[in-house]
Regions:
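Hydrophobic alpha-helical scaffolding
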Residues: 119, 180-184, 222, 229, ...
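Bacterial N-terminal signal peptides that target proteins for export
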Residues: 1-13
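Active-site recognition of the HExxH zinc-binding catalytic motif
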Residues: 367-383, 402-406
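Secondary-structure transition/capping motifs at alpha-helix termini
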Residues: 316-325, 351-353, 365, 379-391, ...
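Post-HExxH zinc-binding segment in Zn-dependent metallohydrolases
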Residues: 225-235, 395-437
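N-terminal helix-rich structural modules
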Residues: 26-189, 207
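C-terminal motif of bacterial Sec signal peptides marking the signal peptidase cleavage site
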Residues: 20-23
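Active-site-proximal, well-structured secondary-structure segments within enzyme catalytic domains
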Residues: 148-155, 189-359, 428-439
């Protein structure tokens, strides 16, 4: 009986000890812990984003080996901190969180445009490669045979918009693209490192990471994109067919092959983004928009800075506050003659509060007039979300910023040009077809 009693007591004691041990273990993370983590991460990242943004601005507007190094170091710091925080955030994967908090953790993971592996050495390598390629692009120029001087990208863009000599256009198109072959090895390594970084964050590759930022699964995003493209595809196939036929009539079937893709160098835009600059060739006979915006700017003696003022007044008319003086003091509006810069137009938010700027080498033409309104659309959107928490001081998704900019650009209608005094009278409604084709 003693043995039986003692064995029973011992079993109870062991069971009790096991219960106590389980009860005294470390508690798992809670939603409150996740909220505190996000707030701490935002505070840390905001400071790093500001530092990296300033370094990137200097590097974009004053390209030297030294500014490349400074920008790469700042970018590597952001990458390292973000990857470390993303790894720390994994502790909340199994926690039942409110949807907004769960989304904040996903935004933390995807806040890097390009992820990098967890290894600090590889993070630094990726930052150097990224900055170096951007610098190469910004410094890019083409030196035609027997030319007195090399051509910068803005100079090539002007020639591309105005020339109708197919040999010259093809020469410029191919010449500009000689800037990229030296980056081939760098780019391949860039993709390798970025895919490895995305994998460390739990994604299959960088593409899946990018597709994860639209409040749906990456596969759902692909399906939605295909659905939307299916809606507009018939229209764009018809438009491209028309443009190809008009270009073939202008240049001949030996240059524009029937049934083949439109030759990229014939569209008047270095990246084949629009056909507005060749509208005189591709526009229907009775669909003249009734005005040429470039000529309107010239006849009204509107210089490059005044073009930006027109953009600001557009937003003034909608009730927005004027741009701060720092915008005018710190933006880059003209291509400088004493240094290399990245001329490609972009909008910047340097301190996530009020230090907004644009960077572009403005030409006095209609295309850049529209681009200015587009870029300012980004700036005013940036000002609109500055009261949000740091992770939410960004576009609702990667496409929304461009949607804002393009919506503003589409507002540059004949009626608007009349209102601001650039055009005397708006063309009749039957000219709308030409206007729509130009912006399609």
């Amino acid at each position: 009986m003693r043995d039986g009693w003692g064995g029973g007591r011992l079993s109870c004691v062991i069971a009790l000890l096991g219960t106590v041990a389980a009860g005294c273990g470390e508690p798992g993370p809670t939603p409150e812990d996740a909220k505190a983590f996000v707030e701490r991460a935002e505070e840390q990242l905001l400071e790093l984003w500001i530092d990296a943004g300033r370094a990137a601005w200097v590097q974009n507007t004053y390209i030297t080996d030294d500014t490349n190094i400074l920008a790469a170091e700042a970018q590597a710091t952001v990458i390292g901190a973000t990857m470390a925080l993303a790894a720390e955030a994994a502790q909340f994967d199994a926690v039942d969180l409110p949807e907004d908090l769960r989304r904040s953790l996903l935004m933390l993971k995807t806040s890097l445009g390009v992820a990098a592996p967890s290894d600090p050495t590889l993070q630094a390598e990726l930052a150097v490669i990224s900055t170096g390629m951007e610098s190469t692009y910004g410094r890019g120029e083409y030196c035609p045979d027997n030319a007195e001087a090399c051509l910068s990208l803005p100079q090539m863009e002007r020639l591309f918009a105005e020339s109708r000599n197919t040999d010259e256009l093809l020469d410029i198109w191919a010449g500009w693209r000689m800037v990229s072959p030296p980056m081939r090895g760098q780019y391949a390594r860039f993709v390798e490192l970025a895919n490895a970084g995305a994998s460390d964050l739990g994604f299959a590759d960088l593409g899946e990471m990018w597709r994860a930022g639209y409040d749906m699964s990456p596969d759902e995003f692909v399906a939605e994109l295909e659905r939307l493209w299916g809606q507009v595809r018939p229209l764009y196939e018809a438009l491209h067919c028309h443009v190809r036929a008009e270009l073939a009539e202008e240049y001949g079937s030996a240059v524009v092959l029937p049934g083949q893709p439109i030759p990229a160098h014939l569209l008047g835009n270095m990246w084949s983004q629009t056909w507005a600059n060749v509208y005189d060739i591709v526009g229907p006979a009775r669909a003249d928009p009734g005005y040429d915006l470039t000529r309107l700017l010239e006849s009204n003696r509107v210089d490059e800075l005044e073009m930006v003022r027109y953009g600001e007044r557009f937003f003034d008319s909608l009730g927005f506050a004027p741009l701060p003086e720092t915008f005018w003091d710190r933006s880059l509006f003209l291509e400088p003659g004493d240094r290399d810069v990245v001329c490609h137009a972009s909008a910047w938010d340097l301190d996530y509060e009020s230090d907004v700027r644009i960077k572009m080498c403005i030409g006095r033409n209609g295309e850049d007039f529209v681009t200015i309104h587009h870029e300012l659309g980004h700036n005013y959107y940036q000002r609109a979300y500055r009261g949000q928490s740091p992770l939410h001081r960004t576009s609702a998704n990667d496409g929304f910023h461009e949607g804002i900019g393009d919506t503003i650009a589409l507002s540059i209608t004949p009626e608007y040009l009349v209102e601001v005094g650039l055009l005397e009278t708006a063309p009749p409604a039957d000219r709308d077809l030409g206007l729509l084709l130009r912006v399609a």
